[in-house]
Amino acid sequence: MSDTKTDVSNPEVLVREKLDELISFRKDNDSKTDFWAKQFDLGLAWVHFPEGSGGLNVNPKFQLLVNDTLRKEGISTNNRIANLLGIGMGAPTIVEYGTKDQIDKYLKPMFTAEEIWCQLFSEPGSGSDLASLSTKAIDDGDGYIVNGQKVWTTLGHLSKWGLLVTRTDPDVPKHRGLTFFIVDMESEGVEVRPLRQITGEAEFNEVYFTDVKIPKENVLGEVGDGWRVSLAILMNERVAIGGNVRQRGSGAPGHLVQLWKDRNLDDPVIKDKLVELWIQQEAVRLTNMRASEL
């Protein structure tokens, strides 16, 4: 990584120049993975992140420019869907609490969706009261030995890495005895059991940890400060899910309007409901745009 700092005196010009380079790269390379890797290297993965971490250290509102440009070019952003828990929740938390080695190791393959991530929070006996969790991590000198169970783990069966919160000190108040880890889901002792839904699919999973060894360099944040890291991840989850700014008239309202046109419908009741739905989505879109500039 170069030590040369990018000139951000005119961030919009900078972002547009990077976008031009990215779109030009696509003309000679149709690999999605290579494209997303190039997007990361250009700082267009999360523009507000520091340089070298997939960002340009500019206002997050310019991510809207990036996303809108890619949509108009017909370029896939499915990596954000396939790896929502990593890209939306894990990445900003690792940038805030992680070491440089962790940032360098995890963020790029996370963004390219080569390594899927999951969140390991809920347990059979602790859902809404997260701090009452019982999964234990015991320091054995050169690492931690983890035993316990998690449940409702989205994409756990597809994940390479997990964001895991455990109890490392049972003798202090419950919110102070937690530590956060990045766990390799392919480690010996990790067992993932899919939970079949009525549809036959298995998006959620039970995950069992039996004497799983996690190296100390995989602690995220400070030992005993897992509650703070957990709150950061939950905040990032809300931003990732609720803050996705769509194009005007996209998504379900756009599809319904097109269906209305294709079938030449003329029902005033349905028309009113369509207009109401469109207005609601537009209000959310504009609110998210405003929030991105704060």
Predicted regions located by residue number:
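Amphipathic, small/basic residue-rich leader segments at the start of a protein or domain
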Residues: 1-84, 95, 101-105, 109-112, ...
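Glycine-rich beta->alpha junctions and the first turn(s) of the following alpha-helix
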Residues: 6, 190-290, 294
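Short Ser/Thr-interspersed hydrophobic loop/turn segments at strand-loop and sheet-helix junctions
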Residues: 43, 66-74, 165-166, 182-188, ...
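Glycine-rich phosphate/pyrophosphate-binding beta-alpha loops
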Residues: 87, 151-156, 198-199
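A short, Trp-centered hydrophobic/proline-enriched beta-strand micro-motif
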Residues: 113-121, 165
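Active-site-adjacent elements of ketosynthase-type condensing enzymes
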Residues: 124-133
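A structural signal for short hydrophobic beta-strand segments in well-ordered beta-sheet cores
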Residues: 135-138
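A short core secondary-structure module
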Residues: 143, 147-193
